From Swiss-Prot:
<dbReference type="InterPro" id="IPR015590">
    <property type="entry name" value="Aldehyde_DH_dom"/>
</dbReference>
<dbReference type="InterPro" id="IPR029510">
    <property type="entry name" value="Ald_DH_CS_GLU"/>
</dbReference>
<dbReference type="InterPro" id="IPR016162">
    <property type="entry name" value="Ald_DH_N"/>
</dbReference>
<dbReference type="GO" id="GO:0003842">
    <property type="term" value="F:1-pyrroline-5-carboxylate dehydrogenase activity"/>
</dbReference>
<keyword id="KW-0520">NAD</keyword>
<dbReference type="GO" id="GO:0009898">
    <property type="term" value="C:cytoplasmic side of plasma membrane"/>
</dbReference>
<dbReference type="InterPro" id="IPR016160">
    <property type="entry name" value="Ald_DH_CS_CYS"/>
</dbReference>
<dbReference type="InterPro" id="IPR047597">
    <property type="entry name" value="RocA_bacillales"/>
</dbReference>
<dbReference type="InterPro" id="IPR050485">
    <property type="entry name" value="Proline_metab_enzyme"/>
</dbReference>
<feature type="active site">
    <location>
        <position position="320"/>
    </location>
</feature>
<comment type="similarity">
    <text>Belongs to the aldehyde dehydrogenase family. RocA subfamily.</text>
</comment>
<protein>
    <recommendedName>
        <fullName>1-pyrroline-5-carboxylate dehydrogenase</fullName>
        <ecNumber>1.2.1.88</ecNumber>
    </recommendedName>
</protein>
<comment type="pathway">
    <text>Amino-acid degradation; L-proline degradation into L-glutamate; L-glutamate from L-proline: step 2/2.</text>
</comment>
<dbReference type="GO" id="GO:0006537">
    <property type="term" value="P:glutamate biosynthetic process"/>
</dbReference>
<dbReference type="GO" id="GO:0010133">
    <property type="term" value="P:proline catabolic process to glutamate"/>
</dbReference>
<dbReference type="InterPro" id="IPR016163">
    <property type="entry name" value="Ald_DH_C"/>
</dbReference>
<feature type="active site">
    <location>
        <position position="286"/>
    </location>
</feature>
């Protein structure tokens, strides 16, 4: 019997043995930095002349790996391989597919610190953030395997006398998984295994900033018994390979995590029916947020300040769930703002390989430039309280930045920055605070810090986000505990790590027999 699901515990790095184990993980990764990695198509390793170079964002001169780069011809080969594999993979027993996930989770668990150390190097994640990313990858495998076992026999429906009706789920076809760089293990693994365990075949196009961890995960799935051709690893340009696969008539669904603009582009392209296409493509998209923490006048203000700082600056604000806006009632505004500034000044920014670092670099030059531009906009729109400096001489480092006294419609209150920047605005009362909280085109996460039960219940009904948290920060959703996904321009309302997520990768079939 399968044990009930429990989320993977986070590592306590105050325990010396855990600290040493993580340091060993860093040594393991250091030893294989700079290697070349192939595409994987039908189990075959394919090297290309053209490469994607993955660098350490904390040290631009350090190459994490050089990864083969797919073009249209190789993408077509991968599509044909996945399409052929679907014919038999879709007929495999759900129990077999679930067992592959259970085994893959066990392999990653044994190599946990190595994977986390790779995230430190490739994504610039500090220890705790990297450890949480790896734990979440394990959680997705454990949770989705169990969910598939629950769904494998379908759902009972009514039958009339002399009639038997069965309602069950079948796979869709070939899925294109386009994964992000900010959770390059967790989200990449979760979106991939959700498609695989439901009986689909996959073309995996990981983010160009973090392709090495995706290759290492493909190796894990192979070791766990995933047959050749079921998962094909094809990093490449979004404009060339991404568009080609989104448009392809044999693509059945696209699972995308990334920016609003790219998500909209994929959604538009996927809607077009191409010659030879015999279905309407399904799009599963998670597209970002502009997330607000509301601080009520009846609130634990220290809890509010701690929650804001952790949610705004964890992983340098590079989470779609990050707090980038604070709406505080005018009665407590100055107190909360001043305490947040105090706490922000205490944060250690630097090399994520050092355990004491709270905040590492941002992902690349393009992100650095964009965030610094938004900081300049913020200086025009509001009052800079702390931070605002950047240094891209060695890596892409930006100081945690707090702006005050913003108009709720200011650009840095409306547009996703995806960096260590948080903006404060005042509300007259709680209704006004909720009105501001709902005034963006997004609807992903939010939090309310309040001791007023009436106001919390009001927020439960009126704060229009997919993940709403009371008296805590707005980041850190745990698989199976906080199904994750938002409204409006935050995506297609899907809930990763929730009980209905796998259904997005299947279609329901009814069979009725008369006797």
């Amino acid at each position: 019997m399968v044990q009930p699901y429990k989320h993977e515990p986070f590592t306590d790095f105050t325990v010396e043995a855990n600290k040493k184990a993580f340091e060993e993980g860093l040594k393991t990764v250091q030893a294989y930095l700079g290697q070349d990695y192939p595409l994987v198509i039908g189990g075959e390793r394919v090297m290309t002349e053209d490469k994607i170079v993955s660098i350490n964002p904390a040290n631009k001169t350090e190459v994490v790996g050089r990864v083969a780069k797919a073009n249209k011809d190789l993408a077509e080969k991968a599509m044909q391989t996945a399409d052929a594999a679907f014919k038999w993979w879709s007929k495999t027993k759900p129990e077999m597919r679930a067992d592959i996930l259970f085994r893959a989770a066990a392999i990653v668990r044994r190599r946990k610190h190595e994977f986390s150390a790779l995230l430190v190097k490739e994504a610039g994640k500090p220890w705790k953030e990297a450890d949480a990313d790896t734990a979440e990858a394990i959680d997705f495998m454990e949770y989705y395997a169990r969910q598939m076992l629950k769904l494998k026999d379908g759902i009972p429906v009514e039958s009339r006398p002399g009639e038997t009706n069965r309602f069950f789920y079948i796979p869709l076809g070939v899925g294109v998984v386009i994964s992000p760089w900010n959770f390059p293990f967790a989200i990449m693994a979760g979106t991939t295994v959700a498609a695989l365990v439901t009986g689909n075949t996959v073309l995996l196009k990981p983010a160009s900033a973090t392709p090495v961890v995706a290759y290492k995960f493909v190796e894990v799935l192979e070791e766990a018994g995933l047959p050749a051709g079921v998962l094909n690893y094809i990093p490449g340009s979004g404009a060339e390979v991404g568009d080609y696969l989104v448009d392809h008539p044999r693509t059945r669904f696209i699972s995308f995590t990334g920016s609003r603009d790219v998500g909209i582009r994929i959604y538009e392209r996927a809607a077009k029916v191409h010659p030879g296409q015999i279905w309407l493509k399904r799009v599963i998209a998670e597209m970002g947020g502009k997330d607000t923490i509301v601080v009520d006048k009846e609130a634990d203000l220290e809890l509010a300040a701690q929650s804001i700082v952790a949610s705004a600056f964890g992983f340098s604000g590079q989470k779609c769930s990050a707090c980038s806006r604070v709406v505080a009632l005018e009665d407590v505004y100055d107190q909360v703002l001043n305490r947040v500034v105090e706490l922000t000044k205490q944060l250690k920014v630097g090399n994520p390989e050092e355990q004491s670092t709270f905040m590492g670099p941002v992902i690349d030059q393009s992100a650095y430039n964009k965030i610094m531009e938004y900081i300049e906009i913020g200086k025009q729109e509001g009052k800079l309280m702390t931070g605002g400096e950047g240094d891209d001489s060695k890596g892409f480092f930006i100081q945690p930045t707090v702006f005050a006294d913003l108009d709720p419609k200011a650009r840095i209150m409306q547009e996703e920055i995806f960096g260590p920047v948080v903006a404060f605005t005042k509300a007259k009362d709680f209704d006004h605070a909720l009105e501001i909280a709902n005034n963006t085109e997004y609807g992903l996460t939010g939090a309310v810090i309040s001791n007023n039960r009436f106001n919390l219940e009001k927020a439960r009904e009126e704060f229009h986000v997919g993940n709403l948290y009371f008296n805590r920060g707005c980041t850190g959703a745990i698989v199976g505990y906080h199904p994750f996904g938002g409204f409006n321009m935050s995506g297609t309302d899907s809930k990763a790590g929730g009980p209905d997520y796998l259904l997005l990768h299947m279609q329901a079939k009814t069979v009725s027999e008369m006797f």
